[in-house]
From Swiss-Prot:
Gene name linked to the record: Tapbp
Protein name: Tapasin
Segments traversing the membrane: 417-437
Keyword Signal belongs to the record: yes
InterPro entries: Ig-like_dom, Ig-like_dom_sf, Ig-like_fold, Ig/MHC_CS, Ig_C1-set, Immune_Resp_Modulators, Tapasin
The keyword Transcription regulation is assigned to this record: no
Oligomeric and partner information: Heterodimer with PDIA3; disulfide-linked. Obligatory mediator for the interaction between newly assembled MHC class I molecules, calreticulin, PDIA3 and TAP. Up to 4 MHC class I/tapasin complexes bind to 1 TAP. Interacts with HLA-G-B2M complex; this interaction is required for loading of high affinity peptides. On its own or as part of MHC class I peptide loading complex, interacts with ligand-free MR1 or MR1-B2M complex, providing for stable MR1 pools ready for metabolite antigen processing.
Organism listed in the record: Mus musculus (Mouse)
MF (Gene Ontology): peptide antigen binding
Domain notes: The N-terminus is required for efficient association with MHC class I molecule and for a stable interaction between MHC I and calreticulin. Binding to TAP is mediated by the C-terminal region.
Disulfide topology: C30-C94, C318-C385
UniProt KW keywords: Disulfide bond, Endoplasmic reticulum, Glycoprotein, Immunoglobulin domain, Membrane, Signal, Transmembrane, Transmembrane helix
Record lineage: Eukaryota, Metazoa, Chordata, Craniata, Vertebrata
Lumenal compartment residues: 24-416
Record's bilayer topology term: Single-pass type I membrane protein
Length: 465
């Protein structure tokens, strides 16, 4: 029994070690940005302490105590995002600034804030924290305590009230496929907030998705679930999951605002802004959607190109068809086999054609190779065109043809099959000719006897008649 208990204890210890190792960073270094006057901005170092050891928060004498924050996250969304942050990943970019609660300015969202003046419960300091990385992007509203704690370390407590989060800040979608833009949000009213309404359950909220492309903003979808009011129609057949996950009476609450865009086109590339509106509070994240489509690669003439010694083979055309984006296509030519046997750069004149556009938004482009005269030693070499594009893996995509030099080609399998069939048909033809010759060489008398014999009626037949 003791060995079993020992194994259980070891397993629990390993699980604890793994959880500690994978718990993400202890603190996030940020920049506190504020107006410096005269149109300029000032930046000061700040830190969000996410967790600490049993000895308490580590001292940070290099920071202003009002910019050293110990984070309390009742909903847990901000802390959960950082717990999954890999240890070897580059540090996320973090900025914070002051935030002033205000009612939503959009007409469709005015029902969220019936009073234009913010409740006194929202008075005090607010911080807007924006974190961006390759793994996630989030925006959080924090409510710091008025004064820092002095013991055991000078630090300011800050409570997370609203978090808006996406786990895929840079989605890449294949041309013609559906785009699903992830969005989650969480809300935990602080004790100081004191909701003016006594109604239990999550508060009303508004969801807004906009796209910015080439400097232009475009509202795609707006929703205020459960509230009356005229909403602008959704554009481009877009839909979204706009709902709280639960209706617990006092929170905290989490919600889903994931956006769905069917059959994306190149014109739908751009930066998408997702905004969650609560009464007098807002959180926003940005996602950059890119559209791609890998090219199909073909090489002509194929699979064999012929040339006589001292003559140039026909021009080779490497076609990269129906790809997107149009920029960044690269075609490289290689020569495999022949003297040396290794792959090397091919000699000849190369160029790219102009881009051809297709109705689905994709494009095609071809690379050309004009070869110099060949020699007998080049018989059997392979000309390879390799296409590189942002939609392809780093190794690219290739097609090849084989050079056959006239007078140096040995019989192939196809040649052997053709010879066998030819011999079989020739043998059959010879037999037929032999039969015909034998028939026509029979003497005429024998033919007449054979004919008379075939016309003689037997006597037995006459009697029967």
């Amino acid at each position: 029994m003791k060995p079993l208990l020992l194994l259980v204890a070891v397993a629990l210890g390993l699980a604890t070690v793994v959880s500690v190792v994978s718990a993400g960073p202890e603190a996030i270094e940020c920049w506190f940005v504020e107006d410096a006057g005269g149109g300029g901005l000032s930046k000061k170092p700040a830190t969000l302490l996410l967790r600490h050891g049993p000895r308490g928060p580590p001292p940070r004498p290099d920071l202003d105590p009002k910019l050293y924050f110990k984070v309390d996250d009742p909903a847990g969304m901000l802390l959960a995002a950082f717990r999954r942050y890999p240890a070897g990943a580059s540090a996320p970019h973090c900025e914070m600034s002051r935030f002033i609660p205000f009612p939503a300015s959009a007409k469709w969202a005015r029902s969220l804030s019936p009073e234009q003046n913010c409740p006194r419960a929202l008075d005090g300091d607010w911080l807007l924290v924006s974190v961006s990385s390759t793994l996630f992007s989030l925006s959080s509203l924090l409510r710091p305590q008025p004064e820092p704690l002095r013991e055991p370390v000078v630090i300011t407590m800050a409570t997370v009230v609203l978090t808006v989060l996406t786990h895929n800040p840079a989605p890449r979608v294949q041309l013609g496929k559906d785009a699903v833009l992830d969005l989650r949000f969480a809300y935990a009213p602080s004790a100081l907030e004191g909701s003016p309404s006594l109604d239990a359950g999550p508060p009303p909220f508004g969801l807004e998705w906009r796209r910015q492309h080439r400097g232009k903003g475009h509202l795609l979808l707006a929703a205020t679930p459960g509230l009356a009011g005229r909403m602008p129609p959704a554009q481009e057949k877009a839909t979204a999951f706009a709902a709280w996950d639960d209706d617990e009476p006092w929170g905290p609450w989490t919600g889903n605002g994931t956006f769905w865009l069917p059959a994306v086109k190149p014109s739908q590339e751009g930066v998408y802004l997702a905004t969650v509106h609560l009464p007098y509070l807002q959180g926003q994240v940005s996602l950059e959607l890119t559209v791609h489509k890998a090219p199909r690669v073909s090489l002509t003439p194929a699979p064999v190109v012929w040339a006589a010694p001292g003559e140039a083979p026909p021009e080779l055309l490497c076609l990269a068809s129906h790809f997107f984006p149009a920029e960044g296509l690269e075609v490289k030519w290689e020569l495999r086999g022949g003297p040396g046997g290794s792959s090397r750069k091919v000699e000849g004149k190369t160029w790219l054609s102009t881009i051809r556009h297709h109705s689905d938004g994709s494009v095609s482009q071809s690379g050309h190779l004009q070869l110099p005269p060949v020699t007998a030693k080049q018989h059997g070499v392979h000309y390879v065109c390799r296409v590189y594009h942002s939609s392809l893996p780093a190794s690219g995509r290739s097609a090849d043809v084989t050079l056959e030099v006239a007078g140096f080609s040995g019989p192939s399998i196809e040649d052997g099959i053709g010879l066998f069939l030819s011999a079989f048909l020739l043998l059959g033809l010879l037999k037929v000719l032999g039969w015909l010759a034998a028939y026509w060489t029979i003497p005429e008398v024998s033919k007449e006897k054979a004919t008379a014999a075939s016309l003689t009626i037997p006597r037995n037949s006459k009697k029967s008649q």
